[in-house]
């Protein structure tokens, strides 16, 4: 290494400009490629952090993040709380493979009615799912619940086991998101108790 500026000038004078441009081109390509790989890796890690491995829905990590950072700033929200009926019976009778199929069937139906913009759906627990709707339209939640119920009847015939769910709904200001989710959960539990007595 020689810090003498005259030496540096002589070196650059001896190297053709085309070689210098080529070297810079390779450097830029390397930097761009490395940045793309880093971005892809970050996206993959984010997906794994936020996504439930079985259902491919948002998981509890993503739910907690949104409840903490996003929903308190939304004017009006509606929470729909679903709980898959008889999962233990399905697992015990047909095996966990069919239990997973039932969970995936409900999850795919819910996902079909989400848009990741104003209707996001999360796997809340083992057999529990939550959809949170930003600033819902009149009757929107009822239409979704009805459509999900009808679609589950069709899915039941596809996998040859009955798939149904208890459901509860609650609405309010986003600043009260925790309480709204609790109210929807309570309504779902009341619906489940009714299902058991039918």
Task: Locate predicted features.
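Hydrophobic transmembrane alpha-helices
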Residues: 1-14
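Signal-transducing coiled-coil linker helices
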Residues: 15-53, 61-71, 123
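Conserved long alpha-helical elements within nucleotide-processing catalytic cores of c-di-GMP signaling
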Residues: 47-50, 59-78, 85-115, 122-126, ...
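Short catalytic/binding micro-motifs of nucleotide second-messenger systems
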Residues: 112-117, 147-160
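Short hydrophobic/aromatic beta-strand micro-patches
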Residues: 132-134, 170
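Catalytic/regulatory signature loops of cyclic-dinucleotide turnover enzymes
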Residues: 153-161, 176-198
């Amino acid at each position: 290494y020689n810090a003498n500026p005259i030496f540096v000038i002589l070196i650059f004078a001896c190297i053709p400009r085309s070689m210098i441009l080529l070297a810079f081109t390779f450097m830029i390509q390397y930097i761009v490629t490395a940045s793309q790989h880093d971005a892809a890796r970050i996206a993959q890690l984010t997906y794994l952090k936020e996504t439930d491995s079985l259902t491919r829905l948002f998981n509890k990590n993503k739910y907690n993040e949104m409840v903490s950072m996003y929903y308190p700033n939304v004017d009006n929200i509606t929470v729909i709380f679903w709980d898959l009926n008889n999962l233990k019976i399905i697992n015990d009778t047909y095996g966990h493979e069919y239990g997973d199929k039932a969970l995936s069937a409900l999850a795919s139906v819910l996902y079909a009615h989400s848009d990741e913009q104003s209707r996001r759906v999360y796997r809340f627990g083992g057999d529990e799912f939550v959809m949170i709707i930003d600033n819902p339209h009149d009757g929107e939640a009822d239409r979704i619940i009805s459509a999900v119920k009808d679609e589950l009847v069709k899915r039941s015939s596809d996998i040859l086991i009955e798939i149904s769910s208890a459901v509860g709904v609650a609405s309010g200001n986003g600043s009260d998101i925790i309480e709204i989710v609790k109210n929807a959960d309570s309504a779902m539990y009341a619906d489940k108790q009714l299902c058991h007595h039918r």
